[in-house]
Amino acid sequence: MYKRQVIRCWHSTDVAACPGSGKTTVLLAKLKLLADKMPLEKGAGICVLSHTNVAVDEIKNRLSDYADRLLNYPNYIGTIQSFIDRFVTMPYLRNISGQNVQVVDSLTYAQHMLSKMQHEAKYKALDYVTRSNFETGGQFSDRINHTQALHIRGDGALCIGKQKKPLAGVGKASAGQYKELLAELLKDEGIIRYQDAYVYASVAIDELPAEYTDLFSSRFQYVFIDEYQDCNNLQRQAIDVIFDPQKCAVFKIGDSDQAIYNSAEDTTPDWMPQPDFLPIVTSCRFNQEIANVICKLKKSEKNIVTLAGATGVKPV
């Protein structure tokens, strides 16, 4: 009953699943139904987003019989981060830098930074401060590793690694030169670090014009976000800004009891489905005796109803 309700729903909604509920199978069923309706009106497509390449590959492999209809333009199936990078962050960076931008590893980036610090007079203060800290600190084997550890703290101070004492305060020349150096590497050499992509994505999302976001809601008539409980703050913000649930059907599919936490510092709140969400509370993963124990640990009040028979061993 629960799965049928989700499969038959074609308007924006949250779908709250439970472990072993077969939500991926439900998603695939909806996609196959859409494939039979293609091409959609006005040349619109579908967008399917998940968190990992493994999950995306699984979806693509299980849709192989429908590849000609689902895996090509105007449809998009990929990770949430790749979607944000392709359609939000990179267009924004091309606009402000005037060239295609490449994301490089921190070692390569540090090599470019150090070269400019050592050879360009406008970074004299930054070179002096960082060289002095490297020579007296004794924590790093070479200046490349030392340069990789440089960062601007939340208050604007220039810091190194996890040291609490900054190398330079927010008003110091070296802190300002560090910011100028990062901006120059983007504008002149077209490179950023992986860690910078997150920051630029946040800025790009905030500056997205309404006309641009309207294009997404027009191009993608149906949007599916799998494992939504694992979305971080930036990804949730991007999805809410890019896709208008009044103009296209947005399905946020997840299980708040199976969220993956990236670190102790992660401030992303637990996902709480909207009050009118559709539940999938039937599970094939375990027996009812085990489900009854698991229910006591769940965040939601919905019980899990299993489709398996009784077990001969009661849970402890």
What are these model-derived regions, one by one?
Residues 237-311:
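Conserved RecA-like helicase ATPase core segment
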Residues 18, 86, 91-129:
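DNA-processing P-loop NTPase/helicase core
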Residues 3-19, 25-26, 45-47, 122-224, ...:
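Accessory N-terminal region flanking or inserted into the helicase ATPase core
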Residues 42-56, 75-77, 253, 280-282, ...:
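Conserved RecA-like ASCE P-loop NTPase motor core of nucleic-acid helicases/translocases
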Residues 227:
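Walker B catalytic acidic pair
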Residues 3-95:
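P-loop NTPase Walker
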Residues 30, 58-63, 83-87, 200, ...:
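Alpha-helical scaffold elements adjacent to nucleotide-binding pockets in ATP/GTP-utilizing enzyme cores
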Residues 38-41, 69, 214-216, 242-246, ...:
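Conserved catalytic network of the ASCE P-loop NTPase/AAA+ motor domain
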